[in-house]
Amino acid sequence: MVVLHGAEVTVPGRLPLSRLVLSRVLKNASHIIAAGEYPASEARHAGGNSLPITVIPPGVDTQRFRPLSSDERITSRREFGVSDDAELIVGVSRLVPRKGFDTLIEVAAALHASRPRLQVLIGGGGRDAVRLQKLIDKLGAPVRMLGRVTDEQLPRLYGCADVSAMLCRSRWGGLEQEGFGIVFSEAASCGVPQIAGKSGGAADAVLDGLTGKVVQNPSDVAQVANTVAHLLDDAFLRSLMSVASRERALNTFDYNVLTKSLAQVLTVVAR
């Protein structure tokens, strides 16, 4: 059995010699479990359309990642130093260039004059942290870097946001893409609409127009700014996306649901 997430099939699948090896491995697999339609598509590109593939997305603990009550939301905002009436965007990830936080910072700076209550919190660490902080300082953007967020804090950080955003983008001619984006399903489980960049499996994680928005060109500051402003301006749309996000998390990403799916696959393979 082979399990695929993203880069381990995308990169060798695009290089002639390694593609031959990958194709042989995939064709000889008793079954293939893919984390989304993106790695499944990449596998078919390398090994053919007849591969035995089942898509089982990454899971989320829907009891731990849950919507906050109004009081919990206020308390959580105060924990992170955010005012009750702020328009809060939260981004959580390993900080590397393809995650697109530089674009989010530029968007926050561009919108700040017309939206003085806008606040962006970025949680996570990584090699891009220093560059991002310099960009924040240069632009005077209403963005605060939180550094590493503990597992205990994470659900509250998502839950107190109006929108969660990670503008993931493809790099190196498509060799570097987003495999899935577990941060999107965590935010969804908290009932928070998500904004994703169109890259790899992000469109599997975020249903465009239903649980959030997928930006076609995540490096286009104007396009992203329009998307952000649209969601922040429309509280009713956000409430619809909140409900849809939570329902999808319970029905699609919950560990109990995924365990049953995996058990069915293993039962078939074991016969």
PLM segments and residue spans:
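A short, well-ordered alpha-helix in the C-terminal region of glycosyltransferases
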Residues: 75-78, 230, 237-251, 258-261
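A short helix/loop element that forms part of the nucleotide-sugar donor recognition site in Leloir-type
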Residues: 66-82
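Conserved donor-binding/catalytic core segment of Leloir-type glycosyltransferases
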Residues: 83-99, 105-109, 121
